[in-house]
Amino acid sequence: MIYKGLLYKDLFLLKESFPIVALAVLFLLFSITLGFTGGFLALCIMLMVFAVKVVESTLIYDETDGWDSFVLTAPVSRKEIVRSKYLLQILFLTGAFLISAVILLLISLIPVFSGEEWLFLMLVVGFCYALVYGAVMIPIYLKFGQHTSRYVAFAVLIVVAGLYGATFGFTMFLEFAASTIPLLIGVLVLSLAAYGVSYSISQKIYAKREF
């Protein structure tokens, strides 16, 4: 019940951002009609990055409005607050991934898009790197606040984008040979491990934070 209330609060704050998601989906559908599979993949990745960054928005709202000091007067623990942020991020990111995967599956049935299986692989890689970006940014926002973290977020996003591009080039070089699957599994395991470490760090940071 506590998590439901915390998630509802964050969703209420984010309601003005939902039209942006709808606009991204429209661009995505537009790219499909033009046959731009590469553009489709880029928009899918952007959608997942946006899904991750929504938690950054809630952290900024909380800091600006002094929500943390207020909610801690209620029967809500600091661990539950941090946990709700990670849960919200996972829900949004998983939702963005599933939406992209379903649409990709549907368009793969269209003859003009046949032979584009590599998009599925890169979508999974994009999910992993979006997860890593979220894992890095939540503890940074909790530790340094919104002003410093905004610059760090931009730098981290550039690094993650570079890693994604490098993985994309390496995967294309392999031409999706059998060694591609172990690569994807390795990236997924590392991203999940990073997320687990991030959660532990965030809990320690928030437990010591003064309001």
Segments from the language model and where they lie:
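Short helix-to-coil transition segments within interhelical loops
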Residues: 72-78
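Alpha-helix N-cap/helix-start motif at helix boundaries, enriched for small hydrophobics
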Residues: 80-82
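Hydrophobic alpha-helical transmembrane segments of membrane proteins
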Residues: 1-66, 84-211
